[in-house]
Amino acid sequence: MKLYDRPQTLLECRIFVRRLSWLVIDILLAAALTIALLGFSGGVFAQSIKFGYAALNAGQVAPWIAKESGYLSKYGIEADLIYIPAVAATQALIAGEIQLAQVTGVSTAGAILAGADVRIIASVQNKLAGTIYARPEITSPEQLKGKMLGISRFGALSDTAVSIFLQRYGLKRNTDVAVVQMGGLPEIITALERGAIQAGFANPPQTSRAKKLGMRQLFDLNTLGVDLQQTCVTVTTKYLRERRPVVKGFIQAYAEGLHRFITDRDFSIKVMKKYLRIDDKDILDDAYTFYSEKLEKIPYPTLKGIKFIIDEMAEKNPQAKNASPESFVDLSVLQEIEKSGFFTQLWKN
C-alpha cells in the first residue's frame, strides 16, 4: 500500500496513519534544521548579544563598523551596542548584563585581581595614548599645584594616564593636584570649558574639541611610547566556554570592522559621526588620522602592556605583585582564527 492509496481495511488505515505520522515528523525536523541554519548564517534567528563599549572616542570604532557594514550579521550575530562609561562597562560584564565589552586593560586588570572571571581576548590599542589639556592660563604642569585635574572615572585608563603624567613632573596626586571624576571623556572637556577644572585627560575627538575651545596642550602622553594595554575586548570565561562559536564570530566581524576602518576613510568618518554624534568634519578627520595610524591590524593584546599595568597596581594592591600577564588573557580564539589563515586573507590586498 502506498501513502497516497485510499485505505480499504482497518489494518490499512492503521498503516496509513503511522506513515503519515512519520511524514509529519520528517517535515518538522527539516523545518527545525532550516531554522537552525538560518540562525547560524545570520538570518532572522541570529544570536543576540549585548556589547558594551566604555568610551566615546574613535578608538572604539571597530565594533561600530562591524555592525554598520553587516559583518556581525554575516557571522550570525545580532548585536546591541551600548555605551557604558569607563569601569561601569566591566562591572556590567561581570554582572551578566552584557556578553562582551570593549574596555581598557586597566579596568580589566583591576577586576581580575579582585577575583572577577574575566579575560582579555582581543585588542586594538597596545600603546598609551592621550593628552593632558589645560585652561589657557596654565602654561606649565607645575602651575597645576592646588588645582583640579579631571579624569573619566577612578580605575579607568585616564586615571592611570594622569598618574603617569603627575609622576613625570614630580607632582603628588591629591596632595599637589586634586584628581576628580567627571564621568566620561566629553564631560572632561565640558568641565574644562566651564572652568570647573583646570586640566584634564583627552583623546581624539575630544583633543580637537579642546583645541577649538582654546585650551592648551600641556603634555602629549603619546610621545612616551609606553606599552600599555589600552582598548581591548573582554569576556567572562563562562560565556566563552558556553558560547565559543558566538565569540569567534564576533572577533572575526570585529577584525573585518577594523580592516575597513583602516582602509575606508569616508565610510569610517560617517560611522564615527553617527556614534560620536559629532558633525564637525575637521574634528572627525583629525580623529580618523590619529587612530588609523595607532590601531593594531591583527588584534592581539600586549602582555608587556599588561605587565606595565600590573606593576603600577602592585604599589597599592599586594595581589598584583606575583600576578602573571598570561593569566589575564585567553588567546585561544585569536590563535584559532589566525591558524585558519583568516587574517592573512583579510589583509592580502
Indicate residue ranges for each PLM-predicted region.
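Secondary-structure end/capping motifs
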Residues: R241-A323
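Cleavable N-terminal signal peptides
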Residues: L33-T34, V44
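N-terminal secretory signal peptides that target proteins for export/translocation
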Residues: M1-L23
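Sec-dependent signal peptide hydrophobic core
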Residues: S21-L33
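Pocket-lining segment of extracytoplasmic ligand-binding domains
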Residues: S107, P186-R277
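Short, glycine-/small- and polar/acidic-enriched structural segments
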Residues: Q47-R194, Q198-P204, Q217-L221, V226-D227
